[in-house]
Amino acid sequence: MDLVEKLKNDVKEIEDWIIQIRRKIHENPELSYKEYSTSKLVAETLRKLGIEVEEGVGLPTAVVGKIRGNKPGKTVALRADMDALPVEETSDVEFKSKVKGVMHACGHDTHVAMLLGGAYLLVKNKDLISGEIRLIFQPAEEDGGLGGAKPMIEAGVMNGVDYVFGIHISSSYPSGVFATRKGPIMATPDAFKIVVHGKGGHGSAPHETIDPIFISLQIANAIYGITARQIDPVQPFVISITTIHSGTKDNIIPDDAEMQGTIRSLDENVRSKAKDYMRRIVSSICGIYGATCEVKFMEDVYPITVNNPEVTDEVMKILSSISTVVETEPVLGAEDFSRFLQKAPGMYFFLGTRNEKKGCIYPNHSSKFCVDEDVLKLGALAHALLAIKFSNK
């Protein structure tokens, strides 16, 4: 029996077990940096499987499992993120979130369950492993700022790793379909804040003021022109202003106005140009109207997620032995799995969960987000298959 058929048979034994783990985590979602129950479940499950466990790797809720083969080989890292979102679940499932205002609306519950399933398969087939398989259960991917990957890397989780892989469940693709691409697959999220300092006064006498709201509107229109007139239209790129705050009363022109938003890009040159254009636009418009301004970009945001081309070619061939594999367009969402890919070659890929018959049609981050649980065994199978194949390279 070849490796694929062996793993397919093995995963049938634990399909229901994987689903039950997923449902338990789904019922008890935890926000970024607070994944205490989830990490406890992970550590206990790994220990029951006889896997070496290290807790608190860079963050209190981070967990790392290590499976060592019987002969020298490569070190392969597999990653699952664990945190939920501040979303009130409105889906009607029997294992609905028990925590008010918190939901696994991005499928990280499935990521944990699939990697635990992969761990089971790897232990059962330990004689096929060379080197080491490192199981990374990461907190705080949804943080959007520092994120959980960076402190884990600083604590040494990627030391000696030769390859790294990560799966994300997605309703953008049909159930059971793997989707990935060579090169940039997800964007970098440059969060920005613009503050306009004007001079307040009475709403009936705007000529005696420096109106920060009026100036902010001019800035907003000009910023949206960056996409239309400054960036090559074939480049995936977007700017969104997502908050504008100013003022307290209908007859008072305020002193200040504040805008926040995000720039998403897949190219470092485009990213740099856009930030430079924004600074110049804000400075120029504020100068024209006599205001002062601040433009701040969040530091050390998630990098662009870049799949290694050679590894991706090989992985797509391997995954095609267990399901359909398609090449996807880049996604302008962001992922701190990108930090792992800066430390070792690897690949990030999606596993489709869209199933209209089961009502699994809502996008990630929706309060009605739904997962076709039939695909979870595929995720576990993919983890184990890639780990074994690449540990023996």
UniProtKB/Swiss-Prot annotation:
Q: Which cofactor does it need?
A: Zn(2+)
What are the EC numbers?
A: 3.4.17.-
What is the enzyme's class at the highest EC level?
hydrolase
Entry GO MF terms: carboxypeptidase activity; hydrolase activity; metal ion binding; metallopeptidase activity
Q: Which of this chain's residues are annotated to bind Zn(2+)?
A: 104, 109, 245
Q: Which GO terms describe its biological process?
A: proteolysis
Could you tell me which InterPro entries the record lists for this protein? Amidohydrolase, Bact_exopeptidase_dim_dom, Peptidase_M20, Peptidase_M20_dimer, Thermostable_CP
Q: Which UniProt keywords apply?
A: Carboxypeptidase, Hydrolase, Metal-binding, Metalloprotease, Protease, Zinc
The active site lies at 302 (proton donor), 373 (nucleophile)
| Coiled-coil parts of chain | none
Q: Which CDD domains match?
A: M20_Acy1_YhaA-like (cd08021)
Q: Which Pfam families match?
A: M20_dimer (PF07687), Peptidase_M20 (PF01546)
Subunit field text? Homotetramer.
Q: Which PANTHER family match?
A: METALLOPEPTIDASE, PUTATIVE (AFU_ORTHOLOGUE AFUA_6G09600)-RELATED, PEPTIDASE M20 FAMILY MEMBER
Protein family (similarity comment): Belongs to the peptidase M20 family.
Function as written in the Swiss-Prot or TrEMBL entry: Can release basic, acidic, aromatic, and, to a lesser extent, aliphatic amino acids.
Question: What's the name of the protein?
Answer: Thermostable carboxypeptidase 2
Organism, by scientific name, is Saccharolobus solfataricus (strain ATCC 35092 / DSM 1617 / JCM 11322 / P2)
